């Protein structure tokens, strides 16, 4: 979707794909559970941990929530997606696309969105601006607030076979 504006120019498509693969495309945004830590003392949001996120996902695309929280040294707290995050999402998604095409917001482990965050995102998710896509990823769809679920199109993706995961991890070393 982030390459769709480059219909004819193969070099631009390759450039966009490289940015996507390195998770650095300026129109690809990620939100994930965080909390305060030694690095961030208050109002923690995903933007404070974006480098660690990219590194973690590139290293292990199958990372679990507990592995993620351990990676960012949040051990005695629950990771969550807070109202502060909703404010960041609203800011980011109100801007024009950097490269002139789609904007994509991936919310990983969306079931960790607190009620205040969900309520603040309702209108944006229901009526996103043109060429805006939200992907809410969850392991527990029943934990997502019904008001959010009702505004989304559900696509079930079965879990990846553990054998495939093991083979992929072995290949990576």
Predicted regions mapped to residue ranges:
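Clamp-loader machinery-focused feature within the broader ASCE/P-loop NTPase space
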Residues: 1-112, 116
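Charged, glycine-rich active-site and insertion segments that engage polyanionic ligands
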Residues: 1-22, 130-133, 139-173
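Conserved adenine-binding aromatic site and its adjacent loop/helix in ATP-hydrolyzing domains
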Residues: 91, 123, 150
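Conserved catalytic/switch belt of AAA+ P-loop NTPases
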Residues: 94, 119-130
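Alpha-helix C-cap/termination motif
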Residues: 96-99, 127-128, 172
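Structural recognition of the conserved hydrophobic beta-strand(s) that form the central parallel beta-sheet
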Residues: 104-108, 121, 132-138
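Generic recognition of short, well-ordered alpha-helical segments
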Residues: 116-120, 147
């Amino acid at each position: 979707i982030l390459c769709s504006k480059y219909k004819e120019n193969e070099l631009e498509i390759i450039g966009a794909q490289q940015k996507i693969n390195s998770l650095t495309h300026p129109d690809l945004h990620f939100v994930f559970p965080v909390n305060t830590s030694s690095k961030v003392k208050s109002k923690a949001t995903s933007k404070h941990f974006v480098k660690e996120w990219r590194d973690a996902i590139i290293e292990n695309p199958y990372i679990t929530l507990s592995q993620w929280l351990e990676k960012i040294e949040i051990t005695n707290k629950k990771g969550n997606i807070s109202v502060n995050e909703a404010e960041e999402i609203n800011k980011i998604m109100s801007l024009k696309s950097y490269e002139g095409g789609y904007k994509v917001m991936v919310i990983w482990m969306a079931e960790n969105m607190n009620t205040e965050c969900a309520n603040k995102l309702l209108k944006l998710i229901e009526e996103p601006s043109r060429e805006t896509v939200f992907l809410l990823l969850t392991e527990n769809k029943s934990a997502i607030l019904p008001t959010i679920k009702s505004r989304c199109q559900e696509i079930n993706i079965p879990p990846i076979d553990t054998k495939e995961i093991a083979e992929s991890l072995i290949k990576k070393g």
